[in-house]
From Swiss-Prot:
Belongs to the OMP decarboxylase family. Type 1 subfamily. It holds the Pfam family OMPdecase. The active site is at K62. Homodimer. Pathway: Pyrimidine metabolism; UMP biosynthesis via de novo pathway; UMP from orotate: step 2/2. This is Orotidine 5'-phosphate decarboxylase. It comes from the Bacteria. The keyword Flavoprotein does not apply.
Length: 232
């Protein structure tokens, strides 16, 4: 099977609407991301419904806690059978290492474990507001390096950091990029954005795209256009 680069971010407060959308797209064309709102509303059974329909799921809950608690949450995600799960890199090396180690018994069936660096909505002024007098890119590099040293599979980062991180951390270190907007779509609340082709050319491995697909009149056609653009 082709390794789909597009991850569609589901953003619904109604489960029926979410599943109605999912039934309009092909599991071969993308993966799906389930975040905090949907998981809190609908729980693990919603993820199981997506699995029944043939989709791989990125469980985007950004765990951040003491090592014991965080690692057990990651193990619960593995038990659920998700393809990818993430933790906040700012939780530190011990937290990330514990989360990686708890997945070892799952072998090849384990989910990818990804670190979250700097949220794409954050600018330098936001970092300064929490006491970090550093440019977003510099902080991303610091946290991404810590993530790799902790043995994780990759990081979530903006496309602007992708090229630099690929060079710094190697081609095998996966880069998951939100803030992706196909040409002609609105910027929304993501501050650091790039088109799908630009992001892949910069080094991103997986592209998180939400409203430009979920709110499209023909989401399957939008997915096809994006995937076609990535093969040029």
């Amino acid at each position: 099977m082709i390794d789909q680069k597009v991850i569609v971010a589901l953003d619904y407060d109604n489960q029926a609407d979410a599943l109605a959308f999912v039934d309009r797209i092909d599991p071969a064309s993308c993966r799906l991301k389930v975040g905090k709102e949907m998981f809190t509303l609908f729980g693990p059974d919603f993820v199981r419904e997506l699995h029944k329909r043939g989709f791989s799921v990125f469980l985007d809950l950004k765990f951040h806690d003491i090592p014991n608690t965080c690692s057990k949450a990651v193990r619960a995600a593995a038990e659920l059978g998700v393809w990818m799960v993430n933790v906040h890199a700012s939780g530190g090396e011990r937290m990330m290492t514990a989360s990686r180690e708890i997945l070892e018994p799952y072998g090849k069936d384990r989910p990818l474990l990804i670190g979250v660096t700097v949220l794409t909505s954050m600018e330098q002024s936001d970092l300064a507001g929490i006491g970090l007098n550093v440019a977003p890119q510099d902080h991303v590099i610091r946290l991404a390096t810590l993530t790799k040293n902790s043995g994780l599979d990759g990081v979530v980062c903006s496309a602007q950091e992708s090229s630099l991180l690929k060079n710094e951390l190697g081609k095998e270190f996966k880069l998951v990029t939100p803030g992706i907007r196909p040409l002609g779509s609105e910027q929304g609340d993501q501050r650091r954005i790039m088109t799908p082709l630009e992001a892949v050319q910069a080094g991103s491995d997986y592209l998180v795209i939400g409203r430009p697909i979920t709110q499209a009149v023909d989401p399957a056609a939008v997915l096809q256009a994006i995937n076609t653009s990535l093969t040029k």
